[in-house]
């Protein structure tokens, strides 16, 4: 698997280019020889589908064709020594044409102002934001087999593109393993005497790998969006909201452990990284929290580590504790050696008192604490804290109240009941609104809530939506 990943990274015209053209060419040619054309092509399709997840199948497929063609030509015995450099340069030039058939990216025009190796490296760094709302829907068994029998290769290509573009944040080895097993299942079952029985049996055997791949995509998407430190605080917020009766000492090690797992596994070349790390993490979850919360205790009775992890991951926030209001960290807290500890303590204490979803808290806490920390570097830090703390406290309170209003009634009701209550609230708030306008308002608000008012809401999408909804609060 590691050898496969070397190939895929080289195909992206990335790190190998910095080591020299001969090094890059030798790597790619060795991998083509080892894998053969079809596996080389399939793996290229997976890579570019996940890299350019917003592109069409035709755009990705065209790029793959170009890459495979130039690799075949330039790795052939007796090929011109300059072939690889010439063809990759031609590809980067073609990518800059207005009618280029390749994936479109807003950063392409800037790359096209550069020349030679600099342009190739710039192009290699381009990628689309991950798909935070996967749209892939598996066809029925009959539809699968009909498409497979009609065009086995076309079916495989379309599946690799759709699955990889939807779940592209899953670690690459997992993505490769799952798609390979899935296509093997289709090939076996669509040619068997009893496809239905075959599919049931095969899917049961693949269940763990399927869950591991989709769950890894979820958690790695957030990690990619937030980065390591913000991911750590995000997991701390979620755990504090799920188990507000726990202590910081119970939840902080779990947040840090999970963040370390993601930092190791999301870009790992090992297929076993997530498979071995997550079970160990679930043991720690159960050791730390099963006695602190009845829902965690129930989750820890599940029969597999993956089921335990999923149970705890999707667990909603508990009712926040009714505790005295918490004060913002002071200069003494933030300007000494225990800055991180003070911020963790404040994040934990605020989260266990607050029902607003994590995406809201993560968004408002970062600038709030950053502004306070900056007071430490001013000439008169005491005066800075005295001025900034009351202002930041008002902004923080206003932001949280607005977030609670936007997500009111969502988590404790069915979606239908929520929409009824939402309509009543909006009707009371805007009594002169026409029925058609009210309907539009309900649809807009409920769409936002369905995407951004749960504990695992996607950060990139929701951050921009919160900006749009709360612009006055954010600027005040």
Swiss-Prot record:
Position of the signal peptide: 1-16
Phosphoserine carried by residues: 434
Cysteines engaged in disulfide bonds, as pairs: 29-75, 74-83, 96-112, 111-122, 145-190, 189-198, 220-266, 265-273, 286-300, 299-311, 335-376, 375-384, 407-453, 452-462
GO cellular component terms given for this protein: extracellular space
Pfam families found in the cross-reference section: Serum_albumin, VitD-bind_III
Subcellular location per the Swiss-Prot or TrEMBL entry: Secreted
Swiss-Prot/TrEMBL keywords: Actin-binding, Disulfide bond, Glycoprotein, Phosphoprotein, Repeat, Secreted, Signal, Transport, Vitamin D
Cited function: Involved in vitamin D transport and storage, scavenging of extracellular G-actin, enhancement of the chemotactic activity of C5 alpha for neutrophils in inflammation and macrophage activation.
Name of this chain's protein: Vitamin D-binding protein
Species of the source: Mus musculus (Mouse)
Gene responsible for this protein: Gc
């Amino acid at each position: 698997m590691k050898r496969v990943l070397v190939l895929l990274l080289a195909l992206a015209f990335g790190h190998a280019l910095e080591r020299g053209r001969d090094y890059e060419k030798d790597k790619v040619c060795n991998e083509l020889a080892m894998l053969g054309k079809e596996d080389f092509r399939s793996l290229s399709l997976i890579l570019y589908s996940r890299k350019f997840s917003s592109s069409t199948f035709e755009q990705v497929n065209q790029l793959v064709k170009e890459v495979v063609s130039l690799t075949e030509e330039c790795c052939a015995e007796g090929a011109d020594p300059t072939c690889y450099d010439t063809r990759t340069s031609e590809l980067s030039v073609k990518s800059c044409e207005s009618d280029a058939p390749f994936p479109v990216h807003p950063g392409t025009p800037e790359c096209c102002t550069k020349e030679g190796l600099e342009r190739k490296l710039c192009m290699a760094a381009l990628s689309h934001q991950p798909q935070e709302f996967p749209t892939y829907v598996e066809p029925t068994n009959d539809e699968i087999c009909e498409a497979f029998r009609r065009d086995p290769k076309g079916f495989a290509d379309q599946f690799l593109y759709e699955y990889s573009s939807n779940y592209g944040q899953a670690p690459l080895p997992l993505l490769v393993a799952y798609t390979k097993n899935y296509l093997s299942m289709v090939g076996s079952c669509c040619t068997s005497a009893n496809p239905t029985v075959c599919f049931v049996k095969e899917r049961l055997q693949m269940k763990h790998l399927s869950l591991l791949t989709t769950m890894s995509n979820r958690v790695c998407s957030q990690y990619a969006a937030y980065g390591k430190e913000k991911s750590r605080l995000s997991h701390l917020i979620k755990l504090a909201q799920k188990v507000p009766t726990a202590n910081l000492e119970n939840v902080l090690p779990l947040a840090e452990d999970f963040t370390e797992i993601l930092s190791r596994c999301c870009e790992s070349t090992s297929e076993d990284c997530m498979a071995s790390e997550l079970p160990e993490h679930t043991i720690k979850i159960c050791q730390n929290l099963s006695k602190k919360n009845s829902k965690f205790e129930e989750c820890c009775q599940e029969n597999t580590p993956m089921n335990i992890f999923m149970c705890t991951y999707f667990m909603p926030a508990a009712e926040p504790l009714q505790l005295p209001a918490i004060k913002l960290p002071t200069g003494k807290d933030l300007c000494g050696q225990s800055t991180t500890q003070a911020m963790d303590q404040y994040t934990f204490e605020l989260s266990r008192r607050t029902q607003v979803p994590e995406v809201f808290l993560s968004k408002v806490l970062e600038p709030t604490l950053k502004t306070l920390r900056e007071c430490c570097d001013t000439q008169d830090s005491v005066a800075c804290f005295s001025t900034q703390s009351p202002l930041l406290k008002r902004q923080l309170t206003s932001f949280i109240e607005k977030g609670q209003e936007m997500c009111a009634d969502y988590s404790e009701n069915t979606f239908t009941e929520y929409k009824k209550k939402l309509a009543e609230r909006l009707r009371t708030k805007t009594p002169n609104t026409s029925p058609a306008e009210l309907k539009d308002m309900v649809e807009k608000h409920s769409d936002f809530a369905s995407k951004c008012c749960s504990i695992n809401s996607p950060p990139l999408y929701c951050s921009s939506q919160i900006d749009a909804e709360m612009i006055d609060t954010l600027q005040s």
